[in-house]
Every structure is written in C-alpha cells, then in structure tokens.
C-alpha cells in the first residue's frame, strides 16, 4: 500500500486533488493529510508525524498543488521503491557541488516536469548528461530530487527522518533527506514515466537562503557528490566554481525581486499606480 503524506495549507484536502489521486494511482492507498492551515508545523515536523501514522510499505510525500496525469503511477512507484530500496522522485540532479546549491541550480538535471511559472505552462524534459542515445530509459540515478513528490520505503524511514533540529521552515527538506539516504548507502532515483503537473513556482526568500546555508554547513564535508555520470577531478572543480558564481547571482537576483514585491505591497506604490492609471483595472 502507498501512504500519501500531504502537508496542506487548507483545513481539508482539495476534493479535486483527492479525486485525481483516486482516478490515477492504480493501487491500494491511504491519504494522511496534515492540516497546517494555522501554520502550526514546519514541513519537517509535518512529514515526520505523517510518516509515523503511515500503514503502507511505500511512503509518498506530496505537495497539495499538483496533478497526476499517469494512470497507475502508484504501482510504478511501489515497484521502483521496492527494487532500489531508496528515495524515488520525478526530477532532480545527478550532482551536488561543493557550495550552497539546490537541485535546480546544479548543472546535471534529470527528469520531466510540467510546471506553471508566471502564468505560463512549461514542460522541462532533462535528458541525462552524456546519455543522449538513451532517452527511453525510465529510471536514472541521482543525488537529490525535488520535494514536490517523492517516495521511499517505510523501512528506510526507520533509518532516516526529516531533520527538525537543523531546520525550521519549508526549504531543503528534500535535499537533506536525499543526502541522508546517500550517506547511509541508499540510492536516489529519478523516474521519467510518471507525469506530474505542478501549479506553483514559489519565491526565493531570505528564509530559503538561510535554510540553504544550514544545509551546506551540515553536508559540506561530503560534497561534491556525483551519481550516474562520470566526471574528472578537473571537471568537478570547474563545476564547483561555476556553481558558486551562479549561486551568488541567484541570491542577488532574489534579493532584488523580494524588494520589488515589498514595494508593490506598500500604500505609496498602490496610490501612485492609481494616480497614474486612474481608470485602469490591469494589475502592474
């Protein structure tokens, strides 16, 4: 059985999402919905408590803003989890460099995801690095996966858990649990035959960068980590340097975007917009 653990922002699960799960999963399942509408839990606490209540042999941690398009995805997840004994997701990266990186900032992304970014629907299909002639492969070894959806055997959760002591928010739970698995000798796998649509893109806040600093401090001695690809020592060092530069500019850009969002919420901005466009109903 698959135990689907969801930390929700509403008191109850969205009926449309519940119906989507029921019509696509294709195996026995249960939904463990953690009501976090009052913000009583961070994601680490919520997922740990959900996993402790789970009855299934396969634990599935899921966002509440996704839609499944693959029929029988639950059976696929059960099979790959049983075969690998590790963490399974739909998109991730085959390298984590020696810096404060995220799966989506490192260079060797793998997997398929459809997501909504600023109102635009986009599908990213990342072929495995140096394996362009194997696009039909359905599983690929990785270092970390995105937290929008991932699974693991319940037996593995007895060895690793979401780190409530190091972190206190809603970021880095995915990359941290993956590093725990890797350090203990368990694989991380990306499956390319489960089609999921993600409806939010999120924002890079100060909390995100703070949590990522904690992640790097915890795992620095194990980095870099490479899985599923072969890289020379020189290539790894070049990638480390490139990743550090990319992280710097990502942080600077995020700070600027956060300031813009803050200004747009001020009374002065809204008043100025009204004075400049008194009859406009368009959002700026």
Where in this protein do the model-derived segments appear?
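N-proximal low-complexity "stem/linker" segments adjacent to membrane-targeting elements
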Residues: 1-23, 32-33
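Glycine-rich, basic loop-to-helix element that forms the pyrophosphate-binding segment
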Residues: 38-54
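Conserved donor NDP-sugar-binding/catalytic core segment of glycosyltransferases
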Residues: 40, 67, 71-116
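Short aromatic/hydrophobic "clamp" motif used to bind/position activated sugar donors
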Residues: 59
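A recurrent flexible, glycine/aromatic-enriched loop bordering the glycosyltransferase active site
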Residues: 118-152
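Donor nucleotide-sugar recognition loop
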Residues: 143-145, 154, 158-179, 186-197
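Active-site donor/metal-binding and catalytic loop motifs
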Residues: 186-210, 214-218, 236
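Boundary detector for helix-to-coil junctions that initiate low-complexity/charged tails
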Residues: 228-284
């Amino acid at each position: 059985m698959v135990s689907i653990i969801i930390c929700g922002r509403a008191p109850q699960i969205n009926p449309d999402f519940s119906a989507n799960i029921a019509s696509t999963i294709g195996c026995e399942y249960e939904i463990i919905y953690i009501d976090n509408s009052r913000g009583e839990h961070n994601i680490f606490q919520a997922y740990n408590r959900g996993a402790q209540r789970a009855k299934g042999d396969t634990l599935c941690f899921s966002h509440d803003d996704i839609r499944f398009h693959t029929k029988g995805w639950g059976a696929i997840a059960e099979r790959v989890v049983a075969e690998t004994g590790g963490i399974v997701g739909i998109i991730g990266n085959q390298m984590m460099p020696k810096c404060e990186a995220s799966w989506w900032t490192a260079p060797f992304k793998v997997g398929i995801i459809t997501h909504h970014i600023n109102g635009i629907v986009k599908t990213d299909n990342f072929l495995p690095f140096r394996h362009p002639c194997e696009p039909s492969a359905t599983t690929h070894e990785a270092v970390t996966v995105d937290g929008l959806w991932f699974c693991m055997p319940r037996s593995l959760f007895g060895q690793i858990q979401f780190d409530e002591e190091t972190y206190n928010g809603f970021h880095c739970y995915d990359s941290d649990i993956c590093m725990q698995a890797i350090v203990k000798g368990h694989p991380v796998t990306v499956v390319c035959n489960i089609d999921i649509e993600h409806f939010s893109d999120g924002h890079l806040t100060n909390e995100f960068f703070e949590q990522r600093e904690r992640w790097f401090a915890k795992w620095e001695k194990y980095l870099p980590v490479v899985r599923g690809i072969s890289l020379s020592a020189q290539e790894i060092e070049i990638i480390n340097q490139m990743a550090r530069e990319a992280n710097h500019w990502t942080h600077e850009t995020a700070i600027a975007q956060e300031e813009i969002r803050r200004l747009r919420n001020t009374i002065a901005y809204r008043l100025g917009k009204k004075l400049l466009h008194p009859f406009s109903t368009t959002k700026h």
